[in-house]
Amino acid sequence: MNVLAIGAHPDDLEFMCAGTLLKCRDRGDNIFVALTTSGNTGSNTIPTKEENAAIREAEQLECCRHYGAQTMFLRFDDEGLLDTAETRRAVLNAIRWADPDLILCNPPWDPSPDHGMTGKLVTEVLLSVGGKLHPSDYPPLEKMPSVFFYNGDLSQGIVPDIFVDITDVIEEKRQLCLTHRSQFSWIADVRGSTDNEEARRYFSELCMTRSRFGGMQADCMYAEGFIAHLILGYAPNYKLLP
């Protein structure tokens, strides 16, 4: 089975659905990762956008090696992702590249602009994935993938439709979150600190707290929640989640 995880930035997937991807890996799925931006403005200490993007892509590739994932970077500007013909074509291309049975992605209602726009772009092109008159670098799909949004901003009060118990892979997920080392100085700076080690602990706690909250909802120790994308004529297959 092919699984495509789509995120807006490096580190989105590690916080939101790394446990699920690890369980997909362990059952033998083919995993694909696509990012709409490379997070090239996500630092106050790295001097240029180009250097920041290169560092963050390298961190993401390190994580993807743990998933055994193939990776595609769409490289739109961080904090500048818009709904255009160009971005739609790029997202359509990424979906066809992976030929997925299952897509995990940002929810379109996420208040972070790049997060929400990434989810919106996925939903906007979904009915075109099989269309022969929608050109891309890869052939049209012969099946409609099942789409589930990971539970992004917990402040939105969304109750997931389904949970994946990630208790057995939680430590590996935590280590993957900590792979995004470039973000420690960014987090420290926005919190008015220069203590990168404190920021590292915050990153670790954020990963564990989010996962523990999902576990409390799912009646297990640690879990990730997902919301099914319902589209006229298609129902996602819940059994595809591990």
Where do the PLM segments sit?
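Active-site rim/loop-helix segments in enzyme catalytic domains that contact anionic ligands
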Residues: 1-98, 227, 233-239
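Metal-dependent de-N-acetylase/amidase catalytic core
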Residues: 1-4, 84-242
